[in-house]
Amino acid sequence: MELGAKTVFSMKLGSYNFAITETVVLQWIIMAVIILLAIFLTKNLKKVPNRKQSVIEMIVNLINGLVKENMGEKFMNFVPIIGTMAVFILFLNLTGLVGIEPATKDISVTAGFALVSAFLINATAIKRIGVGGYIKSIFSQGPIMVPMNLLEKVTIPVSLCLRLFINMLVGAIVMSLIYSTPAKILLPVPLHGFFDMFDGVLQVYVFVLLTMIFTKLGIEH
């Protein structure tokens, strides 16, 4: 298993040369799959739900409940962004089920998600309490705590990035080691069940949960 993502092709824009890696291509494919799946599942919706519509309603209700429970009624407008993030990361985590290494073992991918979360956290705080209130929250505990409060703005996205990256990387490394031993005949199926299904779903839950908690705390400070 290689830790670095391979370059598939390059794109030149002016004097800049952009390397398009395997993980970037995989994300494009996953986005296309999600869009097509969403179109299929939401086509011809009816008042009396059929099996297909029931699946969609179950997913929507699950995300609604997650946001409501952890952020409250006034944050229900966050359902689309939280839901989109959760579904996208979940699909990326579960690619191991079809023999493709998860894109989330690439730190550039998890860093991208962490930056989106950081933007959401800070932009929401500024929108709700204003620029003045946001700056005041940094200085509210006295000058001695200003460096710590500023450091917190950096450590939150860093921790979100590393938590998801390390957990998915460890799973990929373990599976790679197993496949290089004679035990590969018996062990891959149950191990894939853990690392790709259980751990993959768990990491999605932890990531979006922390994003919601930090977003709410950013307003309450």
Curated annotation (Swiss-Prot):
It is a multi-pass membrane protein. Gene3D superfamilies: ATP synthase, F0 complex, subunit A. GO terms for biological process: proton motive force-driven plasma membrane ATP synthesis. Keywords: ATP synthesis, Cell membrane, CF(0), Hydrogen ion transport, Ion transport, Membrane, Transmembrane, Transmembrane helix, Transport. The keyword Isomerase does not apply. GO terms for molecular function: proton-transporting ATP synthase activity, rotational mechanism. The chain crosses the membrane at residues 20-40, 78-98, 106-126, 158-178, 194-214. It is found in: Cell membrane. InterPro entries: ATP_syn_F0_a_bact/chloroplast, ATP_synth_F0_asu, F0_ATP_A_sf. It comes from the Bacteria. One of its GO terms (cellular component) is plasma membrane. F-type ATPases have 2 components, CF(1) - the catalytic core - and CF(0) - the membrane proton channel. CF(1) has five subunits: alpha(3), beta(3), gamma(1), delta(1), epsilon(1). CF(0) has three main subunits: a(1), b(2) and c(9-12). The alpha and beta chains form an alternating ring which encloses part of the gamma chain. CF(1) is attached to CF(0) by a central stalk formed by the gamma and epsilon chains, while a peripheral stalk is formed by the delta and b chains. Key component of the proton channel; it plays a direct role in the translocation of protons across the membrane. Belongs to the ATPase A chain family. This is ATP synthase subunit a. It comes from Clostridium acetobutylicum (strain ATCC 824 / DSM 792 / JCM 1419 / IAM 19013 / LMG 5710 / NBRC 13948 / NRRL B-527 / VKM B-1787 / 2291 / W). The gene is atpB.
